[in-house]
Amino acid sequence: VAAAIACALFNLKCKIYMGYKDIKRQSPNVFRMKLMGAEVISVENGSGTLKDACNEALRDWSRNYQKSHYMIGTAAGPHPYPTIVKEFQKMIGEEAKKQILEQENRLPDAIIACVGGGSNAIGIFSDFIDEKVNLIGVEPAGKGIETGKHGAPLTHGRTGIYFGMKSHLMQSQEGQIEKSWSVSAGLDFPSVGPEHSWLNSINRAKYVSVTDIEALEAFQILSKK
């Protein structure tokens, strides 16, 4: 949606790739993007989710790089894209830090954020990495880790090369990328931004996973509070 807004503001053509499953799951956002003049292309390949949309967008850009610009909303992919996304998303951490200091006059004990590709999480983590604050990332365990239908590369994957980056990813013993799963379209991704992989390797951040059911139950509890 942000890309569609920016392109509408500057009168630029906007072509957005989305997996066909995500188009169904995020139909209100698709409507908003089309309303602003964006062309939304349904990706039928593979699992029809974020991973496949990213691949198709990169293929398009590689064919038309002289007259187009590639944009991605997650902190993953080849350099410098993870850094670009972090630099824009870090306002989340800056604002959170400012507000808690104003209200509590101290830093929080912990920062907890969901992790798919990891853009929102790295955004809020960024201003606390050098502070004595626990950083906790929560990956989607989907239907359960034991079922294989999850999206938890940091807690149940291993290091590899994917999407132009070295990071943790879900892969078979033969090194083939496995399908991810999450009730949330934004978390349905088989890898994670490389900075999260690094924070995990140096034990600066702790990463855990929760199932779809657990996440929805937590959402209901929070909504009632």
Curated annotation (Swiss-Prot):
Similarity comment: Belongs to the TrpB family.
Example GO molecular function: tryptophan synthase activity
Question: Its encoding gene is what?
Answer: trpB
Q: Write out the catalysed reaction.
A: (1S,2R)-1-C-(indol-3-yl)glycerol 3-phosphate + L-serine = D-glyceraldehyde 3-phosphate + L-tryptophan + H2O
Concerning PANTHER family, the annotation shows: TRYPTOPHAN SYNTHASE (PTHR48077:SF3), TRYPTOPHAN SYNTHASE-RELATED (PTHR48077)
Superkingdom in the source lineage: Bacteria
Tell me, what does this protein do in biology? The beta subunit is responsible for the synthesis of L-tryptophan from indole and L-serine.
Gene3D superfamilies given for it? 3.40.50.1100
Entry annotated with the keyword Electron transport: no
Q: Which UniProt keywords apply?
A: Amino-acid biosynthesis, Aromatic amino acid biosynthesis, Lyase, Pyridoxal phosphate, Tryptophan biosynthesis
How would you summarize the oligomeric state and partners of this protein? Tetramer of two alpha and two beta chains.
**Cofactor(s) demanded:** pyridoxal 5'-phosphate
* Family matches, as InterPro entries: Trp_synth_beta/beta-like (IPR023026), TrpB-like_PALP (IPR001926), TrpB-like_PALP_sf (IPR036052)
Q: Under which name does UniProt file this protein?
A: Tryptophan synthase beta chain
